[in-house]
Amino acid sequence: MEITFLGTSSGVPTRARNVSGVALRLPQRAEAWLFDCGEGTQHQLLRSDLRSSQISRIFITHMHGDHIFGLMGLIASMGLAGTGHPLEIYGPPGLEEYLRACEKYSYMRIGDRLRVHLVKPGLVFEDKEFQVTCLPLKHRVTAFGYRVTEKDRPGRFNLAKAQKLGIPPGPIYGDLKKGKVVTLDDGRKINGSDLCGQPEIGRKMVYCTDTVFCETAVELAQDADVLIHEATFAHKDAEMAFDRLHSTSTMAAQVALLAQVKQLIMTHFSPRYMPGNELTLDDLLAEAQAIFPKTIMAKDFLSYAIPRRKALAKSLH
């Protein structure tokens, strides 16, 4: 699992930063999932080593333009390129109406290539490998934060030990690999977990924007390996943040601290903190790190590989 930031500016693009877009690469599936799709996202994809044909799912947090104005261009390009698979899009109320209006007035035929899912708090998507959930955030319009959870994987099966115990090969090995207890023909009961190493702990990524500090963000981010959280304003501009229902750098850090996440990556920065101004992004980073040291700043095209957690080794001998 690897995160690539395609846009990290709030509201409008700058020369160095595009508006919101984050890709989650899933190499084991040859897929990428996109979180928000601001204007120019497909251009950012062209400048990265991602391909639009890899995108299978798009998760939209809310209906503000800097998070959705790139959708129709990307969808049109993917349709012309013939990706060969339907595109699943998840988002808040109004998303499908917006897309269908764009389709109608631009005379673009989406057809069955696009499947739009209205999200509600709770489960959004689940398969054998991943689960995606969402909770409402606190913004001026309906907004959701997303949590991607990779499911734990069984530990490595010790074939040599199984053979030493005289367990005959066959379908029974499949049950043992799943940690099940099986009964052999000679009456012996074998616990599959005794033949497997420690499970690989699934990784967790949380994406929270746009929002002012709220308890649901803390709940959503609990024990995440990576929390991507907006930090539109500096602490000095907290009054403006509360008025516009955006977060300061210190709010993002407080969410990370309370949720006990492993890594905080801040994004969605106001252009007012560009180099040369009274306050810069270096100041926002220092503010956050004073509360939560494991904080870094996102920039366009930054890639971050989510590390696996280390489990206690279990002897297989």
Curated annotation (Swiss-Prot):
Q: How does the cofactor bind to this protein, according to its record? A: Binds 2 Zn(2+) ions.
> Which positions does UniProt annotate for Zn(2+) 2 binding?
66-67, 210, 268
Question: Can you state the subunit structure given in the record?
Answer: Homodimer.
The UniProt entry annotates the active site at 66
Q: Which family does it belong to?
A: Belongs to the RNase Z family.
What CDD domains does the record tag this protein with?
RNaseZ_ZiPD-like_MBL-fold (cd07717)
Pfam families hit by this protein: Lactamase_B_2 (PF12706)
Binding of Zn(2+) 1, residues:
62, 64, 139, 210
Record keyword tRNA-binding present = no
Recorded GO MF terms: 3'-tRNA processing endoribonuclease activity; zinc ion binding
KW Chloroplast (keyword) present: no
| UniProt superkingdom | Bacteria
Under what name is this protein listed?
A: Ribonuclease Z
Give the record's keywords alphabetically.
Endonuclease, Hydrolase, Metal-binding, Nuclease, tRNA processing, Zinc
Q: What InterPro entries does the annotation carry?
A: Metallo-B-lactamas, RibonucZ/Hydroxyglut_hydro, RNase_Z/BN
Q: Which organism is it from?
A: Picosynechococcus sp. (strain ATCC 27264 / PCC 7002 / PR-6) (Agmenellum quadruplicatum)
The catalytic activity, as recorded, is: Endonucleolytic cleavage of RNA, removing extra 3' nucleotides from tRNA precursor, generating 3' termini of tRNAs. A 3'-hydroxy group is left at the tRNA terminus and a 5'-phosphoryl group is left at the trailer molecule
The cross-references to PANTHER family, in alphabetical order and at most eight, read: ZINC PHOSPHODIESTERASE ELAC PROTEIN 1
Q: Write down the required cofactor(s).
A: Zn(2+)
> Where is the organism placed in the taxonomic lineage, from the top?
Bacteria, Bacillati, Cyanobacteriota, Cyanophyceae, Oscillatoriophycideae
Q: What is its EC number?
A: 3.1.26.11
Q: What does this protein do?
A: Zinc phosphodiesterase, which displays some tRNA 3'-processing endonuclease activity. Probably involved in tRNA maturation, by removing a 3'-trailer from precursor tRNA.
